[in-house]
Amino acid sequence: HILDYLQQKDIPIKNQKLDTGDYGCMIPKNEEFGIPRAIYLDSRVERKAHMDEITGNLQKDTQTAFENELIRSKDIPFTLLVEDLHGYEKMLQGKYRSKYNPFALLGRLNTFKAKYNFEIVYVDKKFTGNWIYHHFYYQVKHYLRAGIL
């Protein structure tokens, strides 16, 4: 659904493995605009389909891989995107398959946010592609205007 959105909007896509996150941004080489080589933005989005995926990532046998992902991304803008507009509410109410205590989960995620400097957003799945595109679009716009890129 994310690639469908980007393709419908004629947004160029480059599939490649990232060291961290599921989505990144690349400004292609365009000498006409003074971009002599492709520029890769140091920013990532990690997509989770629902709260069950997050609680699954925090189980004893999987939490190390999840935390390692956060460690690799702690020095760049990083967002954990949950495709559930009501994900925060579901977390507080314990509406997920895991037996994870809701307040322990809230505490764990907020501790990780503070420790690894990332944010969590909850978005309706039908808007995920739109959110990801505009997230990177406005970062790039800011960085170009500020002369950072």
Give the ranges of each region predicted by the language model.
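Non-catalytic C-terminal interaction segments of nucleic acid-processing enzymes
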Residues: 1-40, 53-149
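Conserved catalytic cores of phosphodiester-cleaving nucleases, focusing on short active-site segments
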Residues: 43-49
